[in-house]
Swiss-Prot record:
GO terms for biological process: carboxylic acid metabolic process. Its EC number is 4.1.1.22. The lineage of its organism: Bacteria, Pseudomonadati, Pseudomonadota, Gammaproteobacteria, Enterobacterales. InterPro entries: Group_II_Decarboxylase, PyrdxlP-dep_de-COase, PyrdxlP-dep_Trfase, PyrdxlP-dep_Trfase_major, Pyridoxal-P_BS. This histamine-producing bacteria (HPB) causes histamine fish poisoning. The gene is hdc. This is Histidine decarboxylase. Transmembrane segments: none annotated. Substrate binds at residue 30.
Length: 228
């Protein structure tokens, strides 16, 4: 159903693994997370953002220490809504490690609704995937991909998803979802949208979009209008 459900799923997994953990998210995080905090009744702490929209890592560590939190649940942005800022996964992990918290003792969700379909196609992308240390990631299908109906995909580690799996005998299946019944058309639309372009076509499409964005920034700044 879009980025909000993907983010809820990631936060839900984090809460199930660490029931008493605190969710840390920055001021530039999507507004849906404040709703998710209420729905999941999860402890949370708001972290300051840097001027570019990226998480303030010093403030993150300061607040984890202040809370004496041993099992933080980190909400990282891979492309914020307004500035497109990408939180540095490597810095987050290094900073938490310096607190003496081992990797197995915290959860890291990545909200890649905006940039999850951009970074795989650019040279030298910022860290954002499972190899870089995340536990779950959500990507929207109606943003860069261009599906006409809001949709998205969330990917998480199987061992964590299995923790919330419930056997439903009358449908002979295990339920691992939040919403249960879902729209059967949107996955097809998202699949078709992805398949409609080759890898190289996606690279060219994204490169053109980034170049156009940079051109707009340059024009604004040359006219004395602050832009980023």
């Amino acid at each position: 159903n879009g980025g909000t459900e993907g983010n809820m799923f990631g936060c839900y997994l984090g809460r199930e693994i660490f029931p008493n953990g605190t969710l840390y998210y920055s001021k530039d995080t999507h507004y849906s997370v404040a709703k998710i905090v209420k729905l999941l009744r999860i402890k949370s702490t708001l972290v300051e953002s840097q001027p570019n929209g990226e998480m303030d890592y010093a403030d993150l560590i300061k607040k984890i220490k202040r809370d004496n939190e041993k099992h933080p649940i980190i909400f990282a942005n891979i492309g914020t809504t307004v500035r497109g800022a990408i939180d540095n996964i490597a810095i987050i992990q290094q900073s938490i490690s310096e607190l003496g918290i081992e990797r197995k003792d915290y959860y890291l969700h990545a909200d890649a609704a905006l940039s999850g379909m951009i970074l795989p196609f650019v040279d030298n992308p910022q860290p954002f995937n499972f190899a870089d240390g995340i536990d779950s990631i959500g990507v929207s299908g109606h943003k860069m991909i261009g599906s006409p109906i809001p949709c998205g995909i969330v990917v998480a580690k199987k061992k964590n998803v299995d923790r919330i799996s419930v056997e439903i005998d009358y449908i002979s299946a295990h339920d691992k979802t939040i919403s249960g019944s879902r729209n059967g058309h949107t996955p097809l639309m998202m699949w078709e949208a992805i398949r409609s372009h080759s890898w190289e076509e996606w690279r060219r499409r994204i490169e053109r979009s980034l170049n156009m964005a940079q051109y707009a920034v340059d024009r604004f700044q040359s006219a004395g209008i602050d832009a980023w």
